[in-house]
Amino acid sequence: MFKYKQVMIVRSDLKLSKGKLAVQVAHGAVTAAFKAYKEKPEWFKGWFNEGQKKVVVKAESERELFELKAEAEKLGIPNSLIRDAGLTEIPPGTITCLAIGPGPEEIVNKITGNLKLV
């Protein structure tokens, strides 16, 4: 059983290719993990040492990502909103992904527990 986890939430309305989705999730995972490393080092260390649990789920829209981000901020969970550079499939500045955590699983689940897996 894991004590910590990280969740990446991608926008289902963008219809990203599998490769594009993978890259956006990777950007989110790395950026949010680095933020946790600086802001919540005990959470980062626990998550890193127990195997770095990651889950990818989907949101319906950009608005939903902002709502989830606000919840994460309210609960003090490190997070990162990803904006695409626009070099391939979508316009520059398009918000594609929100990464939440790593953080305690029970807190992260309060924010993401009702979202569907990709």
Swiss-Prot record:
Name of the top EC class for this enzyme? hydrolase
Protein's UniProt keywords contain Hydrolase:
yes
Cross-referenced InterPro entries: Pep_tRNA_hydro_II_dom_sf, Pept_tRNA_hydro_arch, PTH2
**Keywords, in A-Z order:** Cytoplasm, Hydrolase
What's in the GO CC field?
Answer: cytosol
Tell me the GO BP annotations in alphabetical order.
Answer: translation
**What are this entry's molecular-function GO terms?**
peptidyl-tRNA hydrolase activity
Pfam families (alphabetical): PTH2
By its UniProt entry, which PANTHER family does this protein fall under? PEPTIDYL-TRNA HYDROLASE 2, PEPTIDYL-TRNA HYDROLASE 2, MITOCHONDRIAL
Its protein name is: Peptidyl-tRNA hydrolase
